[in-house]
């Protein structure tokens, strides 16, 4: 299984506001944890993204990608930039650890970023 390509696909789906595409890459029961927030399921994550970003017209872009692929795990550092239609944008460094099962489906995502960097954008 090509975890590098599957990780590319995951972030492409997030950037395209494609909840179905994200779901297709994930195993049943996938768990997601961001910073010190409670662990959530995929439905809760995508509902939050839809409310805060996707339905609000906030675009997501990834840059400066640094990725390490190991056995059933990918660790990626990148800069994520969120941009509103009025041109206002905010960026933060992010570290994401993605775990995969034997079929290459995502079983867990742990993501760490400075959420305060996005406060002015989302208020």
Name the predicted role of every residue range.
Residues 10, 21-22, 30, 45, ...:
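Hydrophobic pocket/interface hotspot
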Residues 60-63, 90-95:
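Short, surface-exposed coil-to-beta transition loops
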Residues 70-81:
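A short hydrophobic beta-strand element
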Residues 93-120:
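Short beta-strand edge/turn micro-motifs at domain boundaries
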């Amino acid at each position: 299984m090509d975890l590098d390509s599957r990780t590319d696909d995951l972030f492409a789906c997030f950037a395209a506001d494609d909840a179905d595409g994200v779901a297709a890459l994930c195993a049943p029961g996938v768990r997601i944890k961001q910073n010190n927030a409670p662990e959530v399921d995929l439905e809760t994550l995508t509902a939050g993204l839809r409310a805060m970003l996707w339905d609000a017209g906030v675009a997501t872009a990834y840059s400066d990608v640094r990725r390490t692929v190991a056995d059933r795990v990918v660790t990626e550092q990148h800069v994520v930039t969120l941009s509103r239609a009025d041109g206002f944008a905010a960026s933060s460094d992010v570290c994401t650890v993605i775990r995969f099962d034997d079929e290459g489906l995502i079983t867990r995502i742990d993501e760490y970023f400075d959420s305060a960097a996005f406060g002015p954008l989302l208020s």
